[in-house]
Amino acid sequence: MSVSAVELASLAAGPDAVRRLGARRGFLGETPANRELARILRDRPETFGSVHSLVLGADEVHVPDLAASRGFAPSLQVFGLECIDGFQRLRILSDALAGLGAEHLEKATVRLEIHCGRYRDVARSLHDAGHRLVNATTAQDGLIRCPNVRWLMAGDWEKEGFFDPRRGVSAGPHRRCFSMPEVTRGLACLSLAPGPEALHLATTDEGIERLWGAVGSELYLGVFRDRMSPLGVVRAVEAYDSARAALRNLPGRLKKGAGHLIDYAPDLICWKACRRLLPLEDLHVEAGSRHDWGGMIEDQLPAVTARTAEDLVRRYEAVHRARGDGPHYKGEAELLDVWREVLG
């Protein structure tokens, strides 16, 4: 049933509410989920009960004569109440009642389940193990809500190929497969954004999760731009891979001293090299492209990347010396501020 939030708000009042309701765990305080629930209740109370139900157990539930209610919503009499699932929500409602008042809570409804008898034991058992029955949601899952990503999913990937933000890409007659991190880093490397911030963020697993979680932001839209094409995605991944391979093939003598930039900040070099050679604005042009993308990526980009590495290593040597941080390069070369200084 749907119940007015104000009718439930007092259930979790008082310091003994956890014991009194037999809840599975006490109030967790200012967790990200609880803060978000409290924010929704404060800003959009009418949507508070749209996701998940409050699950209670009871010794007895007395249902009044509906005919005698004369058109008014009947009140249930519940005895021996137990909170099987949803104590965090109950506590948030209790706090909101004190802070926002009953009139505000009347705008919110909560979906309520009450289980009795043997069904109560079954419900308790399932909810106690609920964390094992739910697939955790990640930022990557949220990509499917992005219209630019959905545009790619509907594209022609040839020969039963596909684009799936969870599984990645299978494209072309040879069924070449790219993971979603590979796709993201390739698109970030060839983005139209004026700076390398997106690619710098995507260099780590934690950073790429943050980028995926920022759907709609300026940084995100610099990577997953409007009307991307399957061919453009393949080009981006191939260009990024080609530049990275060129850096790996450089002789070890170039990777000493300031040359550690090649090992510790390879994506900075790749980003700059791609801008020196490739027509980024035409990345997603498929039919009638004026450029030989295959030739540029396979034949020209490795040499451009090597020359770019030499240029940026010289610049980094000056930056490193000016910063006066001693002989340690690793932590320094990975900093976004250092990338910006090297780019000038």
Residue ranges and their predicted role:
Residues 38, 42, 106-108, 112-280:
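C-terminal catalytic or substrate-handling cores of phosphate/nucleotide-
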Residues 48-51, 76-79, 106-109:
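Short, well-ordered loop/turn elements at secondary-structure boundaries
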Residues 56-57, 83-87, 115-116:
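Short His-Asn-centered micro-motif
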